[in-house]
Amino acid sequence: MDLKVLEVQKWLNLTYGNHPDFPAVTEDGLTGNSTIKALIRGLQIEAGVKVDGVLGSGSLAAIGTISPSLDTSVQTNRNKVYIAQGGLYCKGYNPKGFDGIYGSGMIEKVREFETDAGFISTTGNITPKLLKAILNTENFRLDEEKGDHQIRTIQQALNRSYSNYMDLIPCNGIYGKFTNKGLIRALQHEIGETVDGVFGSGTMSKCPTIKRGGAASKSVVLILQYALCCNKFNPNQLDGVFGAGAERAVKEFQEFVGLIA
């Protein structure tokens, strides 16, 4: 049990327990989907939008950016900061207080989360996109048991380069559905296809043939190198150059899946 998570749960029930669309949160000090959804419901109540525990585009637009510039003498704004602090605690980041004040400890941990998500330039502000990444149960730190450092580097690079075209993906060093869709979205953006994370016939038709001396862009080759690494085929470099290492890795993949090189 985490005492800070318990404090967050108690605050949520005390603050929103009388709202008809707010189911009581179990006060057990354990972070889980029910607590995360309760935090989202609280934000939706404050923003005056449909209360369903789902952070869709409408909710995110209504909530806006949570930052030190919010006037926390206004209770709605203060509650937004409370909820953001609660989200950080549930995510494993200690903002040095659960008080509804966006102080230096909060700024420090938001910056840390931004860095973990892959951003080099950090602001300390919680944008709607960052808020959606905080208010879920996915890990943005390297998984100590299953995480791979190179996979995490790829996840962070995808967030850094393509966050305008997708939600932030977890940076836990584990290749899964979020990273897979991130790779597809990145490719779709680079080839001028509709960005939806689905590798369908349209994406296939626009996808270039990548070969040594070919015309594929550096960005597309880099995405190929990312994908090879994620499938445990080593291209030697993540540099966007289709050299001997990338060519060898592609041939190894072709052999693995039974394709004739």
Model-inferred region functions:
Residues 1-261:
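Cell-envelope/ECM-targeting effectors and their regulatory/trafficking segments
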